[in-house]
Amino acid sequence: MILAFSPAFIRQYRALAETDQQFCNAALEALPTAFGHPHRHAGLGLRALRRGVYECRASQGLRIGFTRHADKLLLQVVGNHDAIRTWLRNSL
């Protein structure tokens, strides 16, 4: 799987505290190899929200929302649970 970053994701990522960026980096390193392999993504908290729309957990309060397009995972949003809910409601 290839990771692609939306402009909104990059903007939100840059606004994170350095420790949150480190948690996010760790999750993003594990995501491509773990996606589609249930036993590998146990620590990521990866789950489907809708068809082709997913979220994973970077830390207890930080989540990453993304969509799947063939062999590419497009990272759309990073933030707390409310940010993911807002993204789902407004963008999809």
What are these regions (language model features)?
Residues 1-29:
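Arg/Lys-rich, positively charged N-terminal/basic patches that mediate binding to nucleic acids
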